């Protein structure tokens, strides 16, 4: 019989001892203590609160804030803000826990803390022609919307609707786009006396061929007459009328 091979046992990575150890519950010294924030650093995430009863400065960390301002991205308390908290015994002294606003409300937060971004969830944007991409209409839209609003099709968001998105020129006087119910399109309606934007002038491109360059060069040259010239001078000229290049005379020493 063949010897059975022993498979090595896979040792699982054990978590750190610090994570396995249960965190000891901190001893509560006082509860629902009111105080004023002395200072708080948003970047570092900690600060100090001055108790109203004993005038003692208590350390506070951002993780101790229970009810944060929902508009703020990070947990924080503002300088000079009135808060309520519990005093617990920490490793290096007294600390604040369960920090809330007055009477258990949300804290205002620091003015240096970043606000949350406001995303538009759902909804659709009407387009110029047709519905295109879009979702369900919003509930906060007025019921008295015009009948020619494009109906949404598909999923996702559509492009924003601009009435005069392709117009470049002076401001209009009473002009706009008029919807044609029969054709389902928009027609540009202009006021009387409005001429519209001026059409741009495009200069034609010049030819870069040798024939075009030669023609341009000949047009710039003055007209030459052959009267009074000898045959020897005529031979020096090129067949198309350009003079032969003259070499510079050597300097006399």
From Swiss-Prot:
SMART domains assigned to the protein according to its UniProt record, in alphabetical order: CSP
Pfam families given in the database record: CSD (PF00313)
Membrane-crossing residue ranges in chain numbering: none
Positions bearing Phosphothreonine: 226
Function: Binds RNA in vitro.
Protein's name in the database: Y-box factor homolog
Gene Ontology CC terms, in alphabetical order: nucleus
Chain intervals for the UniProt region annotation (Disordered): 1-26, 124-178, 224-253
Swiss-Prot/TrEMBL keywords: Nucleus, Phosphoprotein, RNA-binding, Transcription, Transcription regulation
Organism: Aplysia californica (California sea hare)
GO molecular function: RNA binding
């Amino acid at each position: 019989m063949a010897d059975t091979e022993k498979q090595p046992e896979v040792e699982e990575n054990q978590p750190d001892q610090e994570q396995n150890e249960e965190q000891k519950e901190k001893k509560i010294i006082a509860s629902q203590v009111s105080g004023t924030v002395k200072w708080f650093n948003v970047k570092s995430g900690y600060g100090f609160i001055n108790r109203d009863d004993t005038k003692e400065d208590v350390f506070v960390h951002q993780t101790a804030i229970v009810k944060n301002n929902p508009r703020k991205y990070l947990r924080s308390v503002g300088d000079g803000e009135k808060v309520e908290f519990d005093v617990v015994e920490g490793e290096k002294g007294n600390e604040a826990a369960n920090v809330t606003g007055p009477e258990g409300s949300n804290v205002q937060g620091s003015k240096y803390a970043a606000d949350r971004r406001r995303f538009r969830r759902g909804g659709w944007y009407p387009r110029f022609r047709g519905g295109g991409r879009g979702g369900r209409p919003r509930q906060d839209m007025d019921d008295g919307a015009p009948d020619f609003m494009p109906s949404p099709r598909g999923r996702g968001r559509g492009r924003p609707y601009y009435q005069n998105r392709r117009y470049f020129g002076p401001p209009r006087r009473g002009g706009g786009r008029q919807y044609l119910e029969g054709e389902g399109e928009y027609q540009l309606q202009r006021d009387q006396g409005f001429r519209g934007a001026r059409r741009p002038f495009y200069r034609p491109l010049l030819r870069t061929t040798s024939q075009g360059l030669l023609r341009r060069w000949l047009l710039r040259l003055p007209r030459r007459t052959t009267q009074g010239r000898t045959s020897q001078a005529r031979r020096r000229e090129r067949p198309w009328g350009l003079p032969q290049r003259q070499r510079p005379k050597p300097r006399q020493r």
